[in-house]
């Protein structure tokens, strides 16, 4: 600042500087001080404005001079220029209007920086809106078109942003004519892709080409990646129409649920039958699919539970649970070692009889009757059930220590009496065997009751 003042450009220079360094050089006549005198009251003005307005007009004046080339940073001018600077000081009244920009009054003229800067928030909204749902893509951008391209390009590739995002999203979700449809079809596979996908699937070396010549290959958007899992896709061919029919990208066509339900005639989605659920391709494709299943077991360990998984690439398809033992009879031993169904083949007669019997003695009675379980009449089964409970109560009676007034005594006596009533309700049906079994059970309960009474004395 001192250098500038010595050069005679500062508006706050006193008359002393004007005398020695003024444009006239040497001692300036008395005439220059009068024009410079109006400038002396001017420099005090900025401090006043600083106190009042927080640096608005004074700073704007000085930077305005710097931007215009009149004040502290001029390109060349002597005291006539400060005279103009003084004029600019007197032009302070218009400058306070630029308080919104603070002291950068020339920011308006500098379009590139300030114009792009305040626009950025709007552009962010534009880019996000056009990216998310595309509905607002055409609404905002008309304002600052160039800025939209440059700004969005900073975050998304410029060509990619405007063409793919803003155009493709409306076409896929709203199918609006704003955007070129081919772009959207490329981004989100649509009708065109469904026609193209089956041949592509057939050409992929990892997938068995077409074992059913009449069937086309469906397009799995997520399943294509795993080449390590050779897709026995041809088995799914009957559903190709169902795959291609829902053109939109999403739930309808790509996932096998909608198509799998009709494909399984039985109707039960889980373990419906041992016959193949594929009406047309079940028998011919049973030989080729088992080899495909082995790598699938390695890649999808959880799919091993469904033996039909080897017939379908999609891990979440419903067909996993359908044909349980159709195709992979040769692989059944491998699957059986890995898949453990919870007691599927067991007879539940044994389980029901064993679970209530927590004692070793209790298992004897049910085992005696289990061999003839199928031919056992319901009355005999009821007697056996009562005897199981009685055996448990008998053990409780043996462990009982107390008197008749104890609550445990009352409980045991009541439970035994209840079992007696249960035996009384058994209908013999004129069969001597049932009558004899009921008589023995009643005698046993009575003996236990007598034992309990003796213990309670």
Curated annotation (Swiss-Prot):
Annotated positions of the Omega-N-methylarginine modification: 40, 53, 108, 185
Q: Where is the composition biased (Polar residues)?
A: 166-182, 320-333, 347-365
Residues making up the signal peptide according to the UniProt record: none
Q: Which UniProt keywords apply?
A: Chaperone, Cytoplasm, Methylation, Phosphoprotein
GO CC, one annotated term: cytoplasm
Molecular functions per Gene Ontology: adenyl-nucleotide exchange factor activity; protein-containing complex binding; protein-folding chaperone binding; RNA binding; ubiquitin protein ligase binding
**Residue stretches of biased makeup (Low complexity):** 8-20, 274-284, 294-308
Bias kind Pro residues: ranges: 30-47
Provide the primary localization.
cytoplasm
UniProt record, GO biological process: cellular response to epidermal growth factor stimulus; cellular response to tumor necrosis factor; negative regulation of apoptotic process; negative regulation of mRNA modification; negative regulation of protein targeting to mitochondrion; positive regulation of actin filament polymerization; positive regulation of cell adhesion; positive regulation of fibroblast migration
Q: Tell me the segments the record calls region Disordered.
A: 1-101, 113-136, 166-333, 347-377
Localization annotation = Cytoplasm
* BAG domain mapped to chain residues: 379-456
Q: Which SUPFAM superfamilies match?
A: BAG domain
Query: Where in this protein does the record say Phosphoserine is found?
Result: 7
Tell me which tissues or organs this protein is expressed in: Ubiquitous.
What does this chain do? Answer: Inhibits the chaperone activity of HSP70/HSC70 by promoting substrate release. Prevents constitutive TNFRSF1A signaling. Negative regulator of PRKN translocation to damaged mitochondria.
Note the subunit structure: Binds to the ATPase domain of HSP/HSC70 chaperones. Binds to the death domain of TNFRSF1A in the absence of TNF and thereby prevents binding of adapter molecules such as TRADD or TRAF2. Binds to the death domain of TNFRSF12. Interacts with PRKN.
Q: What is this protein called?
A: BAG family molecular chaperone regulator 4
Native organism is Homo sapiens
Q: Which gene encodes it?
A: BAG4
């Amino acid at each position: 600042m001192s250098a500038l003042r010595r050069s005679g450009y500062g508006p706050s220079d006193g008359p002393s500087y004007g005398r020695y360094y003024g444009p006239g050089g040497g001692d300036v006549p008395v005439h220059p001080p009068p024009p410079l005198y109006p400038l002396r009251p001017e420099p005090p003005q900025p401090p006043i404005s600083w106190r009042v307005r927080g640096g608005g007009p004074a700073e704007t004046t000085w930077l305005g001079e710097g931007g215009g080339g009149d004040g502290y940073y001029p390109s060349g001018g002597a005291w006539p220029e400060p005279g103009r600077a003084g004029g600019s000081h007197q032009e302070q009244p218009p400058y306070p209007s630029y308080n919104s920009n603070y002291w950068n009054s020339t920011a308006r003229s500098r379009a590139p920086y300030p114009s792009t800067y305040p626009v950025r928030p709007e552009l962010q909204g534009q880019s996000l809106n056009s990216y998310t749902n595309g509905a607002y893509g055409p609404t905002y951008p008309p304002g600052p078109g160039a800025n939209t391209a440059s700004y969005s390009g900073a975050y998304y590739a410029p060509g990619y942003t405007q063409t793919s995002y803003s155009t493709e999203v409306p076409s896929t979700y709203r199918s609006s004519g704003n955007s070129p449809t081919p772009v959207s079809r490329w981004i989100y596979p649509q009708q065109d892709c469904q026609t193209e996908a089956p041949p592509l699937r057939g050409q992929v070396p990892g997938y068995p080409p077409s074992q059913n010549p009449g069937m086309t290959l469906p397009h799995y958007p997520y399943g294509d990646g795993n080449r390590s899992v050779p897709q026995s896709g041809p088995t799914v061919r009957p559903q190709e129409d169902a795959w291609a029919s829902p053109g939109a990208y999403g739930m309808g066509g790509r996932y096998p649920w909608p198509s799998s339900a009709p494909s399984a005639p039985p109707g039960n989605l889980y373990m419906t039958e041992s016959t193949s659920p594929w009406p047309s391709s079940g028998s011919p494709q049973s030989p080729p699919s088992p080899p495909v299943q082995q790598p699938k077991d390695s890649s999808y360990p959880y799919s091993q539970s469904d033996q039909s998984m080897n017939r379908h690439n999609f891990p979440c398809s419903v067909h996993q649970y359908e044909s349980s033992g159709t195709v992979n009879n040769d692989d059944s031993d491998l699957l059986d070692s890995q898949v453990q169904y919870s007691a599927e083949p067991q007879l539940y007669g044994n389980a029901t009889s064993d679970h209530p019997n927590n004692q070793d003695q209790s298992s004897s009675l049910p085992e005696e009757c289990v061999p003839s379980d199928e031919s056992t009449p319901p009355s005999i089964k009821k007697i056996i059930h009562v005897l199981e409970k009685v055996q448990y109560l008998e053990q409780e009676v043996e462990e009982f220590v107390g008197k008749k007034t104890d609550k445990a005594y009352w409980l045991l006596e009541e439970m035994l009496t209840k079992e007696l009533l249960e035996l009384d309700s058994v209908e013999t049906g004129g069969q001597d065997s049932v009558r004899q079994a009921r008589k023995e059970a009643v005698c046993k309960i009575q003996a236990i009751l007598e034992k309990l009474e003796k213990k309670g004395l």
